[in-house]
């Protein structure tokens, strides 16, 4: 049985021969041809497609120039056939639904019939809706720009809203095609505006261009905002003053304060029903989101609860007591412990989990992976040189931050470290990532944005990975979260900052709260400069004292002793300056062994003696009482700092060397 394609080819050959015969001869075709060509066609149809093409090639090469022109006139319309006009509507719909924006623009310019076909199918609207369903950035942008109300709705409602938007008379009756064209024009103009918004957002992230909103959380007893979570309506924060404060996103006022913890609120998470918080008072509390009532208090850990996560009826908590607790959540009031995981040799600072693994990080410098099904240990991820303060786990990727000032990316299945990111000058306290970016916050007061895809590419240079550094906090960054449009961060400086990359001013135009309006935190260069200035002042003071005692040989040893302390004084000045910038009595996280900090800060605990002067036979002399009081105070401060550092080194040093009065992170 001959195929339709072959029959069509034969018919074309016959028609072509008939046309040319009539033109060339000016008379009907011969009887011999009419009787013989049918048999020839039947014979050609028996050949394969390749044989037919070869046969046609041989014929074409034997045709005259005039005949080739006639063949071209016959074939060209067949190759340029208007399939939009000839195909059934449902096939046209299917074809146009799968083209991209550039192809849609080209289709609009083909002909009026094509433009009408695009209008009937509302293909610009469908392209926007498809992107909104598949891309979180499009979805979020549709809500923030409020064009989501023009999507996924009936045609009549679309026309009404579009007319209202452009101040058209809604009551004017329009025929169906006019309505479709009106909607088509609206969506075809909306699409490039969306693309422009997306391009601007991406550039703002890369350039560190943002609009800043600052929430002042300072109160009589507050000394830092340790944790937070946010949505479009509120920000929930946990503070060192033992409270949870909820902030309204409309006017950024404090709408509610939850009190009950007797220690710093170190971690929290909420959903549409409950807020669950962990504290340095070693308890976990469950709060009703609507009423703010504490409906459950969980007592299990014997020391501070440093982090918690819950999802799908499971909660995991970790503590300074070096353990991890897995809980079953039947309801907000029915939460029972399933199992305790033990294996870390220091405080467990952070946990994360999904339906496959629980991942925990500790001050013992390791990340441990546990099976969610069996709750058994699986493997250890080792590589950080000091304690680990933060991590996030998603898919196959684990990203961790440490007090060795680095960020590491790990493959959870193989345990391989994929990349080490360097750039922070102090402990990396908080870290989050999505499909595009890693955002980290550290004790140097900086927030850094990293390109995740570049970080995963072994060919990428280190200079290409860090997109920007954001400096607005005047204290240590404790916690942050982010989405496609913003970062929300909290700090020891008692503020919550909202970094808006959607409504940022154009690049180069300063904002009222742009980074240039606030001084940066003291960095190494500033500390070195302060040290140099104070050293010069101390040297001048000692030289003046030397001149005074030239005539008094008995006083010269005291001047020499002061000169020997010159370097110590300069270092003490730098340390004092840094301490004043960072704040006093701060809390920190990620201690390798939090107990040892108490030992260091406890004067009753014996430690190694401070280093002796180079000349062991020389007996240290007290400085002259006439020396400036400031010099004496800073010398004493330096001696105390050196003594504490020696004690820390003696105890094994590998972690965060900051004081933790509350035991919180």
Swiss-Prot record:
Compartments where located: Cytoplasm
Its biological purpose: Functions cell autonomously to negatively regulate cell cycle progression. Required to restrain cell proliferation in response to developmental cues. Probably recognizes and binds to some proteins and promotes their ubiquitination and degradation.
Domain named F-box: residues: 81-127
One record GO biological process: neuron projection morphogenesis
Outcome of substituting residue 441 to R: In Lin-32(RH293)
GO cellular component entries: cytoplasm; cytoplasmic SCF ubiquitin ligase complex; cytosol; nucleus; SCF ubiquitin ligase complex
Coarse class of the protein's main subcellular location: cytoplasm
Mapped WD repeat ranges: 220-257, 260-299, 301-337, 343-380, 383-420, 423-460, 472-509
SMART domains, per database record: Beta-TrCP_D, FBOX, WD40
PROSITE patterns (alphabetical): FBOX, WD_REPEATS_1, WD_REPEATS_2, WD_REPEATS_REGION
Molecular function terms from GO: beta-catenin binding; phosphatase binding; protein dimerization activity; ubiquitin-like ligase-substrate adaptor activity
Coiled-coil annotated residue ranges, if any: none
Subunit record text: Part of a SCF (SKP1-cullin-F-box) protein ligase complex.
Region listing for Disordered, in residue ranges: 574-665
Biased composition (Acidic residues): 584-595, 655-665
Keywords: Cell cycle, Cell division, Cytoplasm, Developmental protein, Repeat, Ubl conjugation pathway, WD repeat
Protein name: F-box/WD repeat-containing protein lin-23
Pfam families: Beta-TrCP_D, WD40
UniProt superkingdom: Eukaryota
